[in-house]
């Protein structure tokens, strides 16, 4: 049970080091990243919904991935921006900390489940194109997305519940810009070895449960693409899969550092650097990764801009 320590009711987010002037510069940079992230991912969701050329499983999954990117950055960045404007440390109450950590982990878990599904979708499209529409039909896609969302949110209930049954009596200063799990474990005066081991096993299950199908499917995809006789066909297939692979490398690399370690408090002081990759950089890059290398999306964007210009003229 929670004890009556100040850390059990509120925490102080240490945020970023540096002067007030540096904080204002960082605020401008991250605010720009946040706006571009919101606009870019919203545009992807809109064109996937309205453009008939993008009515396929690949773009259906991409629309949901963009929604998840908006959520994960919105859970973290507004709080971080507010902290950059305030002098000193930022106070966050226990209830807000619980909600933030749960939503962050739940959305992240959902995203990895969806990335695994996207890898399987690309495998079927490249390696079994004649049966693609039969296997990846609308019912299958809706079911996969629903399972990903439900799994992501249900899977993180127990880990977050356990985190806030610990007693935080060492300190209530979190060396991060949000309620980071590794930092919270460092502040606990309980013996957290067993808890950390269970959290490690759960992280391994989520990340490798998604990463292994991704690696296997990409291996099959590459071997299939290399058998395509025309160079233009190979180039087009590689371009389609490269965007997904780029997103996978950034996302998995960051989260493997953050969560796949037996002792969660190990190197926890560097978590804020990698957390920036997950919550700021990856959602920012997502629209560029999936649009600049995709001819269909570029054409849909171009036509959408033309229609908007015509509406304004009229």
Swiss-Prot record:
All ranges on the Cytoplasmic side of the membrane: 46-53, 121-139, 218-237, 293-314
Role according to the record: Odorant receptor.
GN (gene name): OR9A4
Family the UniProt entry places it in: Belongs to the G-protein coupled receptor 1 family.
Any one cellular-component term (Gene Ontology): plasma membrane
InterPro entries, per the entry: GPCR_Rhodpsn, GPCR_Rhodpsn_7TM, Olfact_rcpt, Olfact_rcpt_6C-like
Name of the protein: Olfactory receptor 9A4
PROSITE patterns (alphabetical): G_PROTEIN_RECEP_F1_1, G_PROTEIN_RECEP_F1_2
GO molecular function, one term: olfactory receptor activity
Topology, Extracellular side: 1-24, 75-99, 161-197, 259-271
Residues that span the membrane, as ranges: 25-45, 54-74, 100-120, 140-160, 198-217, 238-258, 272-292
Cystines in this chain: 97-189
Keywords noted in UniProt: Cell membrane, Disulfide bond, G-protein coupled receptor, Glycoprotein, Membrane, Olfaction, Receptor, Sensory transduction, Transducer, Transmembrane, Transmembrane helix
Protein's membrane topology: Multi-pass membrane protein
Sites carrying sugar chains: 4, 190
Cell location: Cell membrane
Main location: membrane
